[in-house]
């Protein structure tokens, strides 16, 4: 498991332009991530997803996020997420630790 505080920095630098994590937070270019863990792809209420995201059918957890965050367009071809991914394993682990904590509060 990664470091939550380091993960928060990764989120602010690489994710917060398009995503929020607060419960009942607003969608931006990307969906609000509250309740992310245990939810299927393409299921955040009120966000308009691509068919690729809606039909992927995987459940978000530490393992699926770890693979997805390395290369989102490879994991879900057709996603509208324009982020290239995080190649460093440590950064991904830190980000996932932060997301696990912040999206369940």
From Swiss-Prot:
The cellular location(s) given in this protein's UniProt record come to: Mitochondrion intermembrane space
Post-translational modification as stated in the protein's UniProt record: Binds 1 heme c group covalently per subunit.
Keywords attached to this Swiss-Prot or TrEMBL record, sorted alphabetically, are:
Acetylation, Electron transport, Heme, Iron, Metal-binding, Mitochondrion, Respiratory chain, Transport
Any single Pfam family the record assigns to this protein = Cytochrom_C
Q: Which InterPro entries match?
A: Cyt_c-like_dom, Cyt_c-like_dom_sf, Cyt_c_1A/1B
GO CC terms, sorted:
mitochondrial intermembrane space
Residue positions annotated to bind heme c are 15, 18-19, 81
Where is it mainly found?
mitochondrion
| Superkingdom of origin | Eukaryota
Q: Name one GO molecular function term.
A: electron transfer activity
Where N-acetylglycine occurs, the residues are 2
The family line of this record is: Belongs to the cytochrome c family.
Q: Which PANTHER family match?
A: CYTOCHROME C
Q: What name goes with this protein?
A: Cytochrome c
Q: Which organism is it from?
A: Entosphenus tridentatus (Pacific lamprey)
Chain's gene name? cyc
